[in-house]
Amino acid sequence: MDTEGFGELLQQAEQLAAETEGISELPHVERNLQEIQQAGERLCSRTLTRTSQETADVKASVLLGSRGLDISHISQRLESLSAATTFEPLEPVKDTDIQGFLKNEKDNALLSAIEESRKRTFGMAEEYHRESMLVEWEQVKQRILHTLLASGEDALDFTQESEPSYISDVGPPGRSSLDNIEMAYARQIYIYNEKIVNGHLQPNLVDLCASVAELDDKSISDMWTMVKQMTDVLLTPATDALKNRSSVEVRMEFVRQALAYLEQSYKNYTLVTVFGNLHQAQLGGVPGTYQLVRSFLNIKLPAPLPGLQDGEVEGHPVWALIYYCMRCGDLLAASQVVNRAQHQLGEFKTWFQEYMNSKDRRLSPATENKLRLHYRRALRNNTDPYKRAVYCIIGRCDVTDNQSEVADKTEDYLWLKLNQVCFDDDGTSSPQDRLTLSQFQKQLLEDYGESHFTVNQQPFLYFQVLFLTAQFEAAIAFLFRMERLRCHAVHVALVLFELKLLLKSSGQSAQLLSHEPGDPPCMRRLNFVRLLMLYTRKFESTDPREALQYFYFLRDEKDSQGENMFLRCVSELVIESREFDMILGKLENDGSRKPGVIDKFTSDTKPIINKVASVAENKGLFEEAAKLYDLAKNADKVLELMNKLLSPVVPQISAPQSNKERLKNMALSIAERYRAQGISANKFVDSTFYLLLDLITFFDEYHSGHIDRAFDIIERLKLVPLNQESVEERVAAFRNFSDEIRHNLSEVLLATMNILFTQFKRLKGTSPSSSSRPQRVIEDRDSQLRSQACTLITFAGMIPYRTSGDTNARLVQMEVLMN
C-alpha cells in the first residue's frame, strides 16, 4: 500500500518535471541540499511568525479578558476613531449654501484662533527661555569675571612666585577670616561710617586708614603718606571725577604734589644719611637745607669728580650743591649757592631768579628759548652732569636725556621728569624739548611696564611710580593682585572714591582695569564695585557686620538693571551668611521688631528686607522668605508662602522635630499674632491659610485615632459633601479653592472614607443585645454611612480635578465593602 502510494507520488513528480522542462524556455536550475535546507527554513520561519502572532493575540485576549476587557471591542473602537473631522481640510461649499458657508467660516475662525494661540504660546515660551538663559549667562559671566583679578595675560599667569611679607603675621586662628591688619582697617571703616550715618562732619578717611600703618612696616607708612599728599588737591565741586581729573589745573596740582612728596622724601633721606654718619658729614653752621646738603656731599662726594665745572663753594662743586638743594625742594638754599658763585655762572643767576619767583616754576617763553639755545650750543655734551641736569630742569629741555649719571634711582628719575612736564602748548617747543604728562604716563605704564620695575621684589616701587604720575587706578589694580597687599589697595581705592577722585568703570562686567571709548588715551578706569565685592568675599560669611560696613560705600551705585548695589549686596550677604536676625532684625512675640545692624544705615528698612525676602523666595528658600516678609509687615506674601509650605505637609503624620511640626508651629504663631493684632491679607490667600491649618488639625486627629473628632472637623469645614443634596454645592465651591487645597483633596477624601468605613465596621461589630440604641437607630445610622460613602464617590467623580487612579480604586473598594 505504502509502496504503491510512493510509486504514484514519484510518477506524478516525474510527470510534473517533464511538463515543466517542456514548456520552459529558461535553463534548468538544480538546487543542492544546502539550498533546499535554507528554503525550507525560510518557509518554516514564515509559518512560525504568523503562528506566534496569532498565539500572542490569543494570550492578550486571555489576559485582558480576565480583567473584564473585551479586546475585540477595543479594536473596533480604535478602528472607528477618525481624525478626519479635526485635521482634514474643510470641504468646499457652493456659493448659495449659506449654512455651509457659515459653518466653514466658524470652523476657520476657530482654527485660526487655535493656531494663533499656539504660535503666541510657543513664542512666549521661547522668549521666556531666552530671557532666562540670558540672565543665567549674565550671572555666570559675573562669577567668571569675579574670579579673574587682573586684566590681560596676567590674569592667566599661574606661576608660583615668592612674595616678601609686608604685613604682620596673621594672629591666632579664630572665627574671623580677617587678619589683624584687615581687622584694624575694618575698625576705621566702622568709625568713618558711624560719623556719616549720624550726620556728623565727614572725617578724613586718609588719616583713619593711615593710622593702621602704625601697626605695619615702613613701606605701608610711606604709602599712606604719599596717598595723603597726592589727594590733598583742590577740586571743582559738583563735577564728576573724569572732568576733575582731566582739567589742566588739577593735573598741574597732581604734579606739584608729587614733586613735593619726592622732595620731602629725599630731604628725609639726607637727614637720615647725615645723622647716621655724623663724623664724616661734619654737620655744622646755621641749621638749614644748605648746611644739610653740604654735609650730605661730604658723604656722597668725598672726593671731587672729574669733569665738574665752574668752581666750588666751601669745598663742594657748585652745580652739585645747586642740584641737591633743588632735589630737597629748597630753592632758597639753591639761590644762596647761586649768589655765592654768580661770577662763574654768567646769565644763569637771572634765569634762576625768574624760575624761582614764577608761580608754576616756569620761565617766560623768551627766556626759556634763550636758555634752550644756550644749552644746545654749549651744554649738551658738557662733562658736568649736575650742570646739565639743572639746565634741563629749569629750561625743560632735552627730555630724551634721562640724566642717568645724576638720577640713578627711580625716585630721582621721577622727580627729574616731573620737573620737565609741561601743560601749555605754545607751539614753539621742539619734540625733544616737550614732555606732557600723558606722554610720561604712557611711557611708564605701557612702554616700561611691570617687567622694567621688578615688581615681585619691589611692588611698592611700581605702585609709587604709577600713583605719583596720577595713574591711581592702574596703581590700585596692580597692588590688588597681590594677596598680601590687597587690603591696602582696597582702602586706597575707598579714599579716592570718597574724595571723588576715582575713575569708575561704567559697567560691572568690565575688567578690573579698563579703558573706555571717549576717555583720554592714558586714562584707565577701575571696576570699583567688583574690587569691593572681591575683597569682602573672603570674610562676608564669617564677618557679615564688617562686610556690611564696606557695602555701605555702594549706597549710591547702580547695577546694569538699575538696582541699588547696596540693596543687592546686603541681600546676597544675608542669604550667604544666614544671619537674618543679626543683620535685618528679629520679630518679637508681641509683633514688634527688634532692630538689626541694617538699622544703623537707613531708617526705612522695609525695602531692604523685602529685597532680601524676594531673593530668598527666588532661590526657593520659602521658609526664610516668609519670616523676612513677616519682618517687613507684608502679610500677603507671608501667607502666600506659608500656603506653599503647608500644602505638602498637611496629610503627613506629625512627629516631634519633624518638618511638619516646625511649619505648623510657625503657622500657628503667625495666625495667633495676626488675629490678635487684626492683621488681614488678601481674602483668597487668607482663607486658604486658615483652611490649611484646619486640615492640619483634621489630619492630626485622624492619625491619632480620634476619628469622631476628625469627622466633626471635616463636617464643619464643608470641604466635601456628606449628603447627596450638597454635592452640587460642594462641586461648585471646589472650583474656588486654591491649588494648595486641591492638591490635598485625594488625601482628604481617603481619610474621610476611612473614617466612614471605620464607623461602619464599629457599628457592625455592635450586637443588638449589647447596644443601648434601638435596632431602628442602628439601621438608620448604617444607611446614613452608606449614603455618605456613596456621596463621596459621586463627589470624587464630579469635581474638575484629576485624582490618581489608586485613590479612586481605594474609594470604590471601601464603598463596596460597606455595601
UniProtKB/Swiss-Prot annotation:
It is a peripheral membrane protein. The modification Phosphothreonine is found at T49. It is found in: Nucleus membrane; Nucleus, Nuclear pore complex; Nucleus envelope. Transmembrane segments: none annotated. Plays a role in the nuclear pore complex (NPC) assembly and/or maintenance. May anchor nucleoporins, but not NUP153 and TPR, to the NPC. During renal development, regulates podocyte migration and proliferation through SMAD4 signaling. This is Nuclear pore complex protein Nup93. Pfam families: Nic96. Part of the nuclear pore complex (NPC). Component of the p62 complex, a complex composed of NUP62 and NUP54. Forms a complex with NUP35, NUP155, NUP205 and lamin B; the interaction with NUP35 is direct. Does not interact with TPR. Interacts with SMAD4 and IPO7; translocates SMAD4 to the nucleus through the NPC upon BMP7 stimulation resulting in activation of SMAD4 signaling. PANTHER family: NUCLEAR PORE COMPLEX PROTEIN NUP93, NUCLEAR PORE COMPLEX PROTEIN NUP93 NUCLEOPORIN NUP93 DEAD EYE PROTEIN. One of its GO terms (molecular function) is structural constituent of nuclear pore. GO terms for biological process: nuclear envelope organization; nuclear pore complex assembly; poly(A)+ mRNA export from nucleus; positive regulation of SMAD protein signal transduction; protein import into nucleus. It comes from Pongo abelii (Sumatran orangutan). Keywords: Membrane, mRNA transport, Nuclear pore complex, Nucleus, Phosphoprotein, Protein transport, Translocation, Transport. The modification Phosphoserine is found at S52, S66, S72, S75, S80, S430, S767. One of its GO terms (cellular component) is nuclear pore. Belongs to the nucleoporin interacting component (NIC) family. InterPro entries: Nucleoporin_int_Nup93/Nic96.
